[in-house]
Amino acid sequence: MLQYQIDRIEHQIAEDRAQTGVFLIGPLERGQATTLGNALRRVLMGGLEGSAVTAIRIAGVNHEYATVPGVREDVLDILLNCKELSVNSRSAELEIGRLVVAGPAEVKASDLQFSSQVQVIDGNRTIATVADGHSLELEVHVERGIGYRPVDRHNEDTSAIDLLQIDAVFMPVKRVNFNIDETAVAEGGSARERLRIEISTDGSITPDDALAQTANQLLELFQPLATVTLVEEVGVEPEPSAEAQIPLEELNLSVRAYNCLKRAQVNSVSDLMGFSYEDLLEIKNFGSKSADEVIEALERIGISIPQSRTSA
């Protein structure tokens, strides 16, 4: 297997603190770049844990179609602005941020007061605009999760009628693009590939960390396949063969042999397969001639029994 290397050839941080990193991975065998790129992209876009605003509460508001006196934006606009906030919570529990701003003022994300567990990535993002003589009291809920979580209206907490739920987007990676460079050539002229992958995040995670977390997830996914062992089903006995299910009557034994076997509770070939030649001789009134007759009848259908118990 080829030993490849990973180089970060570009890293940018935008004004809103979003980050973009470009990585070059290679050399790879033909076809491996596509395999690697698709796997990385799928996990990067939907498999990493992130933080998001999941609900807000505005003083004096109990539904999303309301307006707030003295605030330029309506409640739907405020909901959308809060949904787009980039946050990073290090807590597994619900975190709540609060603000009370008196106008005239432009309410920014940096006005939210969270515990030390939550970082607001872009503090300059505008939430609302408050006019002179008015104020805005806002509560923002932040949680951690994976992927996309729509509001479940059926299970919504109806006891908190003023808590406005938000469809949560927990994905810290916003965009992944990759392409394949096939210009690398190995000794002997065989083609090699390099994967160029561009990762853009919301700033709550660096592209380097996103790539590392993705690689670890894929390792955990594939590692068990390297030590696959077949587990036999416990308590499941194999079904008897068709020959074993043949009734004793169809062996065409003599009357003497047949009657002796019946008295010994032998009703089918399956029962006979538990006997050795010595066991047959121990059946009452069952001599060697009858035993030989049974052996021959079994051999005609392709079944043999051991000579003695020790050879069974």
UniProtKB/Swiss-Prot annotation:
Name one molecular function that GO assigns to this entry: DNA binding
Q: Which GO terms describe its biological process?
A: DNA-templated transcription
Annotated keywords: DNA-directed RNA polymerase, Nucleotidyltransferase, Transcription, Transferase
| Chemical reaction(s) catalysed | RNA(n) + a ribonucleoside 5'-triphosphate = RNA(n+1) + diphosphate
**Region Alpha N-terminal domain (alpha-NTD): start and end of each range?**
1-229
Q: Give me the ranges of the annotated region Alpha C-terminal domain (alpha-CTD).
A: 246-312
Q: What is its EC number?
A: 2.7.7.6
For this record, the Gene Ontology CC terms, alphabetical, are: cytoplasm; DNA-directed RNA polymerase complex
Q: What SUPFAM superfamilies does its record include?
A: C-terminal domain of RNA polymerase alpha subunit (SSF47789), Insert subdomain of RNA polymerase alpha subunit (SSF56553), RBP11-like subunits of RNA polymerase (SSF55257)
Q: Is Transcription among the key words of this record?
A: yes
Q: Which Gene3D superfamilies match?
A: 5' to 3' exonuclease, C-terminal subdomain, DNA-directed RNA polymerase, insert domain, RNA polymerase, RBP11-like subunit
Q: Does the keyword Transferase apply?
A: yes
Return any one Pfam family short name. Answer: RNA_pol_A_CTD
- Read off the InterPro entries from this record: DNA-dir_RNA_pol_insert (IPR011262), DNA-dir_RNA_pol_RpoA/D/Rpb3 (IPR011263), DNA-dir_RpoA (IPR011773), RBP11-like (IPR036603), RNAP_asu_C (IPR011260), RNApol_insert_sf (IPR036643)
The text the record gives for the protein's domains is: The N-terminal domain is essential for RNAP assembly and basal transcription, whereas the C-terminal domain is involved in interaction with transcriptional regulators and with upstream promoter elements.
Q: How does it assemble?
A: In cyanobacteria the RNAP catalytic core is composed of 2 alpha, 1 beta, 1 beta', 1 gamma and 1 omega subunit. When a sigma factor is associated with the core the holoenzyme is formed, which can initiate transcription.
Q: Which NCBIfam families match?
A: PRK05182.2-2, PRK05182.2-5, rpoA
Looking up HAMAP family in the UniProt record yields: RNApol_bact_RpoA
**Function comment:** DNA-dependent RNA polymerase catalyzes the transcription of DNA into RNA using the four ribonucleoside triphosphates as substrates.
- Family to which the UniProt record says this protein belongs: Belongs to the RNA polymerase alpha chain family.
The entry's protein name is DNA-directed RNA polymerase subunit alpha
Its source organism is Synechococcus sp. (strain CC9902)
This protein's gene is called rpoA
